[in-house]
Design a protein with these regions (language model features):
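Short, non-transmembrane alpha-helical segments in secretory-pathway proteins
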Residues: 74, 115-154, 199-241
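Short, low-complexity, polar/charged sequence segments that are solvent-exposed and flexible
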Residues: 30, 176-178, 273
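Short acidic-glycine loop/turn motifs at beta-strand connectors
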Residues: 14-16, 25, 106, 179-183, ...
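Helix N-terminus capping/helix-initiation residues
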Residues: 27-28, 73, 164, 211, ...
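Exposed beta-strand-loop-beta-strand "reactive/processing" segments of non-cytosolic proteins
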Residues: 80-101, 108, 136-185, 231-260
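Preferential activation on post-signal-peptide N-terminal prodomains/segments
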Residues: 1-138
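Hydrophilic extracytoplasmic domains
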Residues: 182-276
Length: 276
């Protein structure tokens, strides 16, 4: 894994002259290598429009996993994100406010808004991501992992992660959208329900997911390759209202024109002659 195994490592922080010196024992490298070998995955390397994309090729033994779900604790969330924690009021339609920010359930999502922060100037993408993560740490820590998938001026989108991959959903219940400016976060959309306890798994059918070679060939023939930025073997998260559960179904996703769309949806649109 590592060609060189130095016994001293120096850690530097950007724009800081100070550093941390760490003495490393030889067995630490053995431990790191063992963990790496246990968790590594094989990726295929494909060229699309003169850029390389690395994709998990193995689609055998994929499972559809089912979990119980529960609602996010709105009271706990409000106490975490509101500034005026002693002045939180709840309306008849479950809308919560501290006199500045507003927190309310809406369908499968929770919407936070702060009207007093709407008139600021846009911030750059790096600042937007930093602000988003700092705000989420105040109360959006329900043991669900997310990663940033879109970073633009004033807007950050984070997708839920599952089994080392990205989760998507048609109703937005697997993503967090943060909008901010120089006055702070003024709107944040997050899932209302989260998966809790593992219930069961069943094998994915042989023909329920395409081979990566088929996906690549289809893209070459039918779409503008310069608009394709990524291909991931992700999961579609869907709810069963009758059983009050959610399922994670393996599925190919294409990042096309800066947004992720399932390969099935992309193919359906192309086959119908619809504009992507």
């Amino acid at each position: 894994l590592l060609k060189e195994k130095p016994d001293t490592i120096y850690l530097y922080k950007k724009d800081d002259k100070n550093y941390l010196q760490i003495t490393v024992k030889e067995k630490v490298y053995d431990t790191v290598e063992a963990i790496f070998n246990e968790n590594k995955h094989e990726y295929g390397k494909y060229s699309l429009n003169n850029k390389f994309i690395y994709v998990k090729e193995k689609t055998d033994n994929l499972m559809i996993d089912e979990y119980s779900i529960e609602d996010v604790n709105m009271n706990k969330l409000a106490r975490g994100i509101f500034d005026k924690k002693d002045n939180i009021r709840v309306s008849s339609n479950n809308e919560m406010t501290d006199g500045y920010g507003i927190l309310k359930p809406q369908g499968n999502r929770i919407i936070y808004t702060n009207p007093s922060s709407e008139d600021g100037k846009e911030v750059d993408a790096t600042t937007a991501v930093t602000n988003a993560i700092n705000f989420l740490e105040l109360g959006y820590n329900e043991d669900v992992s997310y990663q940033v998938t879109t970073a633009l001026e004033g807007i950050t989108i984070l997708q839920q992660t599952y089994k080392d991959s990205i989760v998507f959903s048609k109703d937005g219940s697997a993503e967090i959208i943060v909008e901010d400016n120089t006055n702070g976060i003024y709107r944040l959309t997050s899932p209302r329900r989260i998966s809790k306890a593992y219930l069961s798994s069943k094998p994915l059918g042989t023909y329920d997911i395409e081979r990566i070679e088929y996906v690549i060939n289809y893209l070459y023939k039918h779409v503008e390759l310069q608009s394709v930025d990524d291909i991931v073997l992700g999961y579609e998260k869907s709810y069963n209202k009758t059983k009050n559960t959610c399922s994670y179904v393996p599925m190919w996703y294409i990042k096309y024109n800066d947004r992720y769309v399932s390969f099935k949806s992309l193919k359906e649109a192309v086959d119908k002659g619809e504009r992507l």
